[in-house]
Amino acid sequence: MAVTTHPLQEFYSGPDVPLSSGPDRARRQARMLAAVLRGVAGPAVILDLGCGDGSALAVATTQNPRHRFAGIDWSGDALRRAHALGLTVLRGSVSPRLPVADGVADVVIMSELIEHLVDPDAAVAEARRVLRPGGSLLLSTPNLAAWYNRGLLAAGIQPVFSEVSLRGVFGRPGRVVAGHLRLFTRRALTGFLTASGFRCVTVTGARYHDVPRPLGPLDRAFCRWPSAASILLVHARKE
């Protein structure tokens, strides 16, 4: 497969970009996946797009040993780490095309990937292409309308998760540049997925690991209302 680099791919291959999903995200992803796989009769094929260093994929693989897993990422460093964990991984990108045949996957995972993409339409179309009919998409992404972002924006402060530059953080809390390009509210995300040929089965909320500790209980409470939660979790099926 020919590999073409561009500035964003160089950014995500850089040494300062986090490669690990973190324990909270890994456990959350494994729980979502386990719930979906309960309805699958035989061994399923699961693709993790933007798998990073494979930390979340390793947890899911351990908890679901009878199923087949593969991760796809652009970062060579991330893939080396994932391979060292004994995982099946491929180097590739959701644009223009994944290195996977049509209709091979029972489940596609896009865990906090879509917010990093220039062309989410193409990415979700690729996820749909590689899914079998009725296959599941498990997608998570930061919520633009998280409870604290509503107050920040009203005060004239750039919302958490949003970024105006890859060079530094400007006008919002936090210090890490994550490369977020697209942010969604619950309504925008479900509308987008429906227009992309998916039926949204469930939408739930999750907490954000970087919320200051005193605000942790409040962040957990808002998980009951996904439209105001920190993280949006969607299970959608290919129509």
What role is predicted for each listed range?
Residues 25-35:
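A short, well-structured juxtamembrane/interface segment
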Residues 33-151, 185-186, 190, 233-238:
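Conserved SAM-binding loop
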Residues 4-27, 55, 118-126, 130, ...:
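S-adenosyl-L-methionine-dependent methyltransferase catalytic module, highlighting the catalytic core
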